[in-house]
Amino acid sequence: MGIIAGIIKFIKGLIEKFTGK
């Protein structure tokens, strides 16, 4: 759960970086 949650958080961060210009 910890690793998966970390990956999801990381991907969400990248998406916000690209979408929240």
Curated annotation (Swiss-Prot):
The keyword Cell wall biogenesis/degradation does not apply. It holds the Pfam family PSMalpha. The modification N-formylmethionine is found at M1. GO terms for biological process: killing of cells of another organism. The keyword Disulfide bond does not apply. Induction: Up-regulated by agr. Peptide production is higher in most prevalent community-associated MRSA strains than in hospital-associated MRSA strains. Peptide which can recruit, activate and subsequently lyse human neutrophils, thus eliminating the main cellular defense against infection. Stimulates the secretion of the chemotactic factor interleukin-8 (IL-8). The ensuing activation process triggers an inflammatory response in the host, thus contributing greatly to virulence. Also possesses hemolytic activity, which may contribute to the development of disease. This is Phenol-soluble modulin alpha 2 peptide. It comes from Staphylococcus aureus (strain MW2). The gene is psmA2.
